Curated annotation (Swiss-Prot):
Residues noted as binding dimethylallyl diphosphate in the record, renumbered to the chain: 111, 193, 195, 259, 261, 263, 352, 423
InterPro entries, per database record: Aro_prenylTrfase (IPR033964), Aro_prenylTrfase_DMATS (IPR017795), DMATS-type_fun (IPR012148)
GO molecular function terms noted in the UniProt entry: prenyltransferase activity
General function of this protein: DMATS-type prenyltransferase; part of the fragmented gene cluster that mediates the biosynthesis of fusarochromene, a tryptophan-derived metabolite closely related to a group of mycotoxins including fusarochromanone. Within the pathway, fscG catalyzes the prenylation of the primary alcohol produced by fscA which is necessary for the formation of the chromene ring by the oxidoreductase fscI. The first step of the pathway is the epimerization of L-tryptophan to D-tryptophan in the presence of the NRPS-like tryptophan epimerase fscC.
Protein name: DMATS-type prenyltransferase fscG
Pathway, per record: Secondary metabolite biosynthesis
Length: 435
């Protein structure tokens, strides 16, 4: 057999190495493939995804996603006019990974979120970064992703005015709209999620309000009970009134099966404030065990040597680096989302703890989480997670200041356990990244 056409496999996860033999090294997306492709494949490999699923993730990424994130402009300054700065991460990287932890009988789920970036993104032609996202969903994915339904996507694009070509405010400092898209590779296929960050209120130039989101949401809900309960909490509860709305997300599936997720944030970080929001001021009941589990998890993940105080605010362990892509801190507030299902009377609530601020280090957060998982017989994949984290972080020299783990997300489960997800920023645009 003539082997003169064979290629040497690049080093990396096996599925990625094999696929890389046939990737055009001169393609615009090749640098993204080298970084993001290898890291996503490693996460899937360590989560013990079947090899065929790993190839599916890689093919989907290469064929559908990478062409919509623009070139990797490594080496340019953050404010370079040729480089759009994504709001997804603190260094402007338009990718974020997540690892949803297993329970005692399941395996982890790997997801990732992107901000689509085109040649006109951020310009007067596309001030709200709509065009590339719209192309990705309607041109690239609508015809090939089974079960994809863009009904709610189109509704909220129009409701928030994201498809407009004219700024809602003449104030250059007014909030700009942004859109993110996330992909969850489930056992059969992929679930697509869309995220909406509305622009400034028309006329006022101020940030969007709860009414901004409520007005848009009522247009698709026949049953507004869960939405109304959420709005009542933020208007009338002592802890709720400090919450501000940030973002809305939807699953791009049949609206009868979809969910609305309203993201909110607050400067309050005490355990009492967390419990208040997670229970909607006591309206969500039968979560006493979950609250105790959350207290234990926080003690481990945040490196507390004494029990968590109910009333004291959490101590900031890592301060905001003003030298990165944004002049404001993406991780300076405790974040939650209200999961509003069309058939529910109350929302489910998920907490996002910015461990990048309140955890001592990546090593400390991951090790503390591992201690908790071992106590609950859920640590079967922790060693793999640590290997993946070490590999992703290998490009950042020790002392670089880049923190991989951004959030630890937690939700109460019906059996009293916790649903836990770790979020990871690969830090592609961090100044110290090698390669």
């Amino acid at each position: 057999m003539n082997d003169t056409t064979s290629k040497e496999c690049p080093s990396g996860p096996s599925a990625w190495s094999i696929a890389s033999q046939w990737v055009d090294p001169g393609a615009q997306s090749a640098p993204w493939w080298k970084l993001i492709g290898s890291q996503l494949c490693l996460l899937a490999q360590e989560a013990r995804y079947p090899i065929e699923k790993q190839f599916e993730i890689l093919l989907f990424l290469y064929a559908k996603v990478l062409p919509r994130v623009g070139p990797l402009n490594k080496g340019e300054k953050f404010n370079s006019p040729s480089r759009y700065t994504s709001l997804l991460t603190d260094d402007g990287t338009p990718f974020e990974y997540s690892w949803k932890w297993n329970n005692s009988t399941s395996s982890p789920d790997i997801r990732y979120c992107i901000e689509a970036i085109g040649s006109h993104t951020g310009s007067s032609t596309d001030p709200y970064n709509y065009l590339e996202t719209e192309k990705l969903l309607t041109q690239d994915l609508a015809s090939c992703v089974p079960g994809l339904d863009l009904t709610w996507f189109h509704h909220f694009v129009k409701a928030f005015g994201i498809d407009q070509r004219q700024m809602a405010s003449n104030n250059p400092d007014a909030p700009k709209a942004n859109m993110f898209v996330a992909f969850e590779h489930v056992q059969k296929g992929v679930v697509v999620k869309a995220y909406f960050l509305p622009a400034a209120e028309a006329g006022s130039g101020g940030p969007p309000t709860f009414e901004t989101f409520a007005s848009a949401t009522r247009g698709v809900l026949n049953n507004t009970a869960a939405l109304d309960a959420s709005l009542d909490f933020v208007k009338n509860n002592e802890m709720g009134i400090d919450l501000v709305p940030d973002m809305l997300a939807v699953d791009c599936v049949d609206p009868n099966k979809s969910r609305l997720k309203l993201y909110v944030s607050t400067t309050a970080t005490s355990f009492a404030s967390i419990v208040s929001v997670m229970t909607l001021g006591g309206k969500i009941t039968d979560v006493d065990r979950g609250i105790k589990e959350l207290e234990v998890l926080l003690s481990f993940a945040l490196g507390k040597e004494t029990p968590i105080s109910r009333d004291d605010e959490l101590n900031v362990q890592s301060v905001f680096d003003k030298g990165l892509a944004h002049d404001f801190d993406l991780y300076g507030r405790m974040t939650y989302y209200f999961d509003i299902a069309p058939s529910s009377k109350l929302p489910d609530v998920k907490l996002y703890i910015p461990v990048i601020r309140f955890g001592r280090s990546d090593e400390a957060v991951a090790s503390g989480l591992g201690q908790y998982l071992r106590l609950r017989q859920r640590d079967q994949f922790h060693d793999g997670f640590m290997r993946a984290l070490g590999s992703i972080g290998a490009g950042h020299p020790e002392g670089s200041g880049h923190r991989l783990q951004t959030y630890l997300a937690v939700a109460f489960q019906r059996d009293g356990s916790l649903a836990i997800t770790s979020y990871i920023n690969p830090g592609v645009y961090h100044d110290d990244l090698k390669g």
